Amino acid sequence: MRRALVALLVLAAVGGLGFAYVDHTQPGWWVRLRYPLYYRDSIVGYVHQYHLDPALIAAVVYEESRFTANSRSSAGAIGLMQLLPSTARGIAAHTGGTKFDPRHDLYDADLNIRYGSWYLAHLRQKYAGRRDSGDLALAAYNAGQANVDRWISETPAGRPVRVRFAATRDYVADVHHLVSLYRKAYGDQLGSG
């Protein structure tokens, strides 16, 4: 019994040293296990085109679909960035999309990232000039522009906008947390480290 306890303690110490070594030489390795990064080339390509942080797009994709391209929500949102077909039609019209069928095309990972990135850039531009513009863009991505516009109109000048939906407040906080994790784990691959 005593030998087994000593062996267990030695094994735990060796495991702890191994963990510390890997954590020191490969920072963020544990984050990469929990939070994968797929479609890196599409993410990096479109964020440069739309002037966004690649960690932000990776975080939104993770939060929306966990990088599952064939994801479909109960509300009808489709693909990696969970775009509604009606939203995607509007994006297609603004970006020159032709012969666009949202019921099928939104499952294409590259197109979904392109449209989702464009939409997020559009929302950031729409709310630019406000100190909480980044949060408002994420809130609008999650809850819709009409809700955010209403919240803004109900907010006294100079005050931060109060997001009325708890799920949307959680969404914004979760995306911010994920952005920091993706920067830590993949900053070198995303160019945002």
Predicted regions: what they are:
Residues 4-22:
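Hydrophobic membrane-insertion alpha-helices, especially the h-region
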